[in-house]
Structures are given as C-alpha cells and as structure tokens.
Regions:
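A conserved regulatory-domain signal marking ACT and ACT-like small-molecule sensing domains
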Residues: 1-138
Length: 138
C-alpha cells in the first residue's frame, strides 16, 4: 500500500456474554478498570434478552480470568488491531490488499476521530495469513 503507513498488532478479543439491561456494560467496564485493564476496542451486539460485548484489552489473560471468576461466560479469538491514516481511501486500500490474497473479513469495528489515525479491529478468515500479507507490505 504505497504512500500509507499501516501499523498492526496481533491480539485476542474477548467475547463476554452479558444481560441486555441498563447498567451491565457499565459494571463490566468499571470492573475491568478496577483491575487495571485498559480497553482498546469495544463493540456490542444484542439478541433476545441478552447480548455480548467484544473487547480488545491490554491484558487478555488477566481480563479473561477475572471475568470467568466473576461467573460470566467468556470466549476468546485472535484478531488484528490495525491503525491506518484517517483519510479517504485508506480503508479501501487495506481491504484491497487483503482481498488480493483471498482473505475475507468476517467482521470488524472501528474507532477514531478527526485528525486521528483510524483504529480498526478486523477478523480476517485467516489471521496468520493476513499478518504475513501486512508484514510483506511494510
């Protein structure tokens, strides 16, 4: 991807099942903060009566153990945490690079503001292959 700098990291994402009611997300994030866990990325989904939070945190194993010990159901999977320039076309170029290597994005979420680099959490069909592609493109 000529002209743009991609910074990427391999992380594990936690998927925490929570009740879909007022205060549960606040309680989860406060609980993690109380134990020194920083949240890098968050997305929420809901189903009938319950939901889940997908979180990328700075200490996955500690967070996973804390959440499990509190009685909540939690799962982990590998993801890529990627930072790209917050400019028109940068996301398209990243996705074109991955698509050129037959890598599908199963889901993702982003965060950022004007003037900031864009932070993305992407879940490609093959995380290891995507890492290799991004390393080669440096």
């Amino acid at each position: 991807m000529a002209g743009s700098k991609i910074v990427f990291f391999f992380f594990f994402q936690l998927k925490v099942y929570i009740d879909n009611r007022q205060g549960t997300l606040c309680a989860l994030t406060r609980f993690l903060a109380k134990h020194g866990i920083n949240i890098y990325g968050l997305t929420l989904a809901d189903t009938e009566g319950h939901g889940y939070a997908r979180l990328v945190v700075d200490d996955t194993e500690k967070a996973r153990q804390l959440v499990e010990d509190s009685g909540e159901l939690v799962a982990a999977r590998d993801v890529l945490l990627i930072r790209i320039a917050n400019e028109p076309g940068e996301l398209a170029r990243l996705l074109e690079l991955l698509a050129a290597h037959n890598l599908n994005i199963e889901y993702g979420y982003s965060a950022g503001g004007p003037g900031d680099d864009k932070g993305l959490v992407l879940v490609p069909s093959d995380v290891e292959a995507a890492l290799d592609v991004l390393k080669q493109d440096r």
